[in-house]
């Protein structure tokens, strides 16, 4: 789910934090991708009749189709993807997950009813709501990535939090996810729409955390408090508190502690805090998530050549994919992963801190240059003055 209305809040209050651009702009960059969110998006990319893509044996293959072709698109554009899979969810998230399960059960029932009596739009709408990523989906996607030579790692808990760690450490350029809560985990840069299909023609959104904080006039802790008020995966939102109200409350009171106090002491009782609302626990999960440090052995990764024949065996013979397309994809992987090794120019020219002696020398040269310019201007002004004073016709 992520954070409700957060993109809208940033767009309206810190527009400089958001850049929209083409996928080609990220040539030569390594990106950590929230795998579970990507797989979910592949699964809901259903046909208009509400059916998943399936093999001859009736197995769902939408996740594999999406993972194969969207990864190819990234590699074709010089991006080196690293997929990060979710681990066990934090205990505080269990309430939200239980609600999602209940909603999916209701949607399944509604989907069956819509197939009998509803319109095509109803069928597709409820079909999307029944989708969930299973262990089997994850396992098959991991197998596919290994055969493609694309690295993946397992996060202890939240994939977005692990992506953020890798981005902060400089092991990747950015974290990629549709979930805006990636920013709460302190990802310096969040990329959205990176795994969307080309047909959707959606630009890649690049969101910079430091610019968002600056535009909102908040520190990180206040930003997290704002996100909790907006509505996150860990807590139900406060009824009647929308994005504008949430922003106003944090700006006015500075912290959730003071917001809660103000709401509880309000004689009008305009807002009501849910009976069980452990916002401090939620904040702690954002501030100190269960992650592996970037230098942990399990966070080592590298891109390798695809295993072409094993890829054909898995996708063509087991899953019914077209052999020519799979072989063509493998050829593109081999070629473009080598091309992506050519780092961007910005990677070659990293700024190096200057010594005090070098700084003094540069300042001296700068001052000398200024003095020289002043002297030249003075001489030019004097020459012009003399030229004007000289009588016409004088030799």
From Swiss-Prot:
Cofactor: Mg(2+)
Binding residues annotated for DNA, in chain numbering: 47, 70, 158, 231, 233
Entry's localization field: Nucleus, Nucleolus; Nucleus, Nucleoplasm; Mitochondrion
Enzyme class: hydrolase
Gene this protein is translated from: fen1
Protein name: Flap endonuclease 1
Summary of subunit composition and partner proteins: Interacts with PCNA. Three molecules of fen1 bind to one PCNA trimer with each molecule binding to one PCNA monomer. PCNA stimulates the nuclease activity without altering cleavage specificity.
A Pfam family: XPG_N
Record has Nucleotide-binding as a keyword: no
Gene3D superfamilies: 5' to 3' exonuclease, C-terminal subdomain (1.10.150.20), 5'-nuclease (3.40.50.1010)
UniProt entry tagged with the keyword DNA repair: yes
Region (Disordered): 102-121, 348-395
Compositional bias of kind Basic and acidic residues: 353-389
GO molecular function terms listed in the Swiss-Prot or TrEMBL record: 5'-3' exonuclease activity; 5'-flap endonuclease activity; DNA binding; magnesium ion binding
Major location (coarse): nucleus
GO annotations of cellular component type: cytoplasm; mitochondrion; nucleolus; nucleoplasm; nucleus
Alphabetized PANTHER family for the sequence: FLAP ENDONUCLEASE 1, FLAP ENDONUCLEASE FAMILY MEMBER
Positions of region (N-domain): 1-104
Cofactor-binding details, from the entry: Binds 2 magnesium ions per subunit. They probably participate in the reaction catalyzed by the enzyme. May bind an additional third magnesium ion after substrate binding.
Alphabetic keyword roster: DNA damage, DNA repair, DNA replication, Endonuclease, Exonuclease, Hydrolase, Magnesium, Metal-binding, Mitochondrion, Nuclease, Nucleus, Phosphoprotein
Function: Structure-specific nuclease with 5'-flap endonuclease and 5'-3' exonuclease activities involved in DNA replication and repair. During DNA replication, cleaves the 5'-overhanging flap structure that is generated by displacement synthesis when DNA polymerase encounters the 5'-end of a downstream Okazaki fragment. It enters the flap from the 5'-end and then tracks to cleave the flap base, leaving a nick for ligation. Also involved in the long patch base excision repair (LP-BER) pathway, by cleaving within the apurinic/apyrimidinic (AP) site-terminated flap.
Span list, region Interaction with PCNA: 341-349
